[in-house]
Amino acid sequence: MSLPARLPPTLRALLPVALLVLAAVLLAACSRDAARDSRGLTPPPELEDGVLRIGSDIPYPPFESYAAGSGTLTGIDADLARALAEQLGVEVQFVDIDAEGRIPALEDGRVDAIMSAMTITEARRQLIDFIPYFKGGTGILVPGGNPTGIRVDYHLCLHTVAVQEGTLQLDQLKALNTSLCAGGVNVRIKTFTQHGQAVAELRAGGADAVVTDYAAALNDVRLSDGSLEVIDFQMLPVTYGIGVRKGSGELKAALTDALATLMKDGRYDDILYSWGARAGIWKEVLS
């Protein structure tokens, strides 16, 4: 390439460097566009930095927990989040937030979305938007052999029940105390910041039962060597959702499209099957 003779010597010396920088920028942009086009999806403005930040209450197996001996986050939510990020052509970053802090973290922008076995409720719908992705219910976890004979939800009356703070299950216990367990036969509720603490209280004899997501209860039983069991009853079947900020329509649409693709190509089913959660597969039409 010939340069005009009238360019100052300094500019003539810098121009080749500038052209190299420009070429590198254009090449990187083309590479990103090619990667995005290959998936048919383009990340929304919220993900312009190339990172999808997911808020999760860790640990809460089988949805999110660290693999033994490593710092790798695994579980239904973790694996789905990685697959969604891959579909969108971005990286994923997990942010550990307790159950009560999930929505505030989303609202103030610390995370882009919540994937944390979060049930969709009317109260939460007033604050954030949801993309449904899993169905389940509340399980009742008891010691092996079920010594107290708890079989249904109203059998929890007069019993001590451990539950995690900031969860639908705590709301369910409070509702029992104003309905089936009202009038002096209330459930004695013990709250804990982590699910594992509630289970430890049950093991130590400080509680007669734990109420938690049914999938989590099944996972606790699987790891208990017979010392725990879940009763054959689910309280209030519910739907879990990916939480996004109100007004983030482009991000919601992008995640919805990405999830629909995972459902169509089988990756969604594969993830749930791998965690023994086939009963939670969401087959409704996404909207």
Residue ranges, per PLM feature:
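C-terminal motif of bacterial Sec signal peptides marking the signal peptidase cleavage site
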Residues: 26-29
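Extended ligand-binding regions for polar small-molecule ligands
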Residues: 31, 78-87, 146, 152-160, ...
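Extracytoplasmic small-molecule ligand-binding "clamshell" domains
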Residues: 36-117, 265
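Periplasmic-binding protein-like
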Residues: 58, 135-142, 222-260, 277-287
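Ligand-binding cleft/hinge of the Venus flytrap
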Residues: 66, 82-88, 169-191, 221-223
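Short helix-initiation/N-cap motifs at beta->coil->alpha
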Residues: 78, 93-104, 148-149, 188-200, ...
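Acidic, polar ligand-binding/catalytic clefts
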Residues: 82, 91-155
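A ligand-binding cleft/hinge motif common to bilobed small-molecule-binding domains
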Residues: 101-104, 118-125, 174-175, 203-236
